[in-house]
Amino acid sequence: MGEQAASGDRLFRSIAAAKPKLVTGVPDGMLAETIRLCAASNDFPYIACAREEETIGVACGAAMAGERAVVLVQNAGLLNSIGAFATMALRYQLPFVVLVTNRGVLADPNSYDIEKYMAFEASVKTLTPVFSYAAASLPDDLVPAAFKWAEAARRPAVIALEKSL
């Protein structure tokens, strides 16, 4: 199993351990294995969305109903969703987990991703804390711990998953 597949499996197991009611997201190369495993899971549905702000809406609806939801997006996708994130998730203190692939970091220096990283750093982190982890070495209890934090803080927990050197 390759490094990306192994980290995708590890992330899936952490998501499953948190027992979410649903997982929602849009396609992303770093999350491809996790998305595949979520879509095949019998424990929760994977709701594929066309736009990132739809994932925030789905998660907000679940949280309003008292259910756990996980969002899978890229940093640029969360930036696209910032209006929905601020006016729904933050305004109404809705706890859910957002797993963000943080593109453009030092170990991911594609020229087209660097601005995504800079914009993410400059905007999302002014709204809510962002907890960063190396995608290749995620703790097993990452998503359960993120839910505990989100539920205590009464706001989404944003986890930035980053490639490492």
Language-model segments: what does each one mean?
Residues 1-165:
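Thiamine diphosphate
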